[in-house]
């Protein structure tokens, strides 16, 4: 079996997570976190859509990690993001991290909004 190391260009992969934190691109972020092609930042939750709407033209899908278990996102949040362009996919945060990394490694245009586990 041939193993090849994945190289990420500008976007940063999720390298790990734990209770209340995410390790992304070699840095640790505590609490809710937003990962976009433009960078990684603290996320204010579902009322904080400004950065997501601003990045809408640079992503095709936004993965929303809902914490330990999957749960629906608020309808107003989903509507605001989808009106700006990208699709919204919800899942548990660990699953969202893995899915984001796989699609990022394929060169896809993805974003990630995470609630901590």
Predicted regions and their residues:
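Non-catalytic interface/targeting segments
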Residues: 1-46, 105-117
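Short glycine-/small-residue-rich flexible loop motifs, especially phosphate/cofactor-binding loops
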Residues: 19, 75-78, 100
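Compact, glycine-rich, soluble single-domain proteins
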Residues: 34-59, 65, 92
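Short, low-complexity, polar/charged sequence segments that are solvent-exposed and flexible
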Residues: 41, 51-56, 81-84, 107-110
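Short active-site-adjacent helix-start/loop capping segments
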Residues: 42-44, 70-73, 98-99
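Mid-chain, well-packed structural core segment of small domains
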Residues: 56-91
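C-terminal structural segments of small proteins and small subunits
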Residues: 83-115
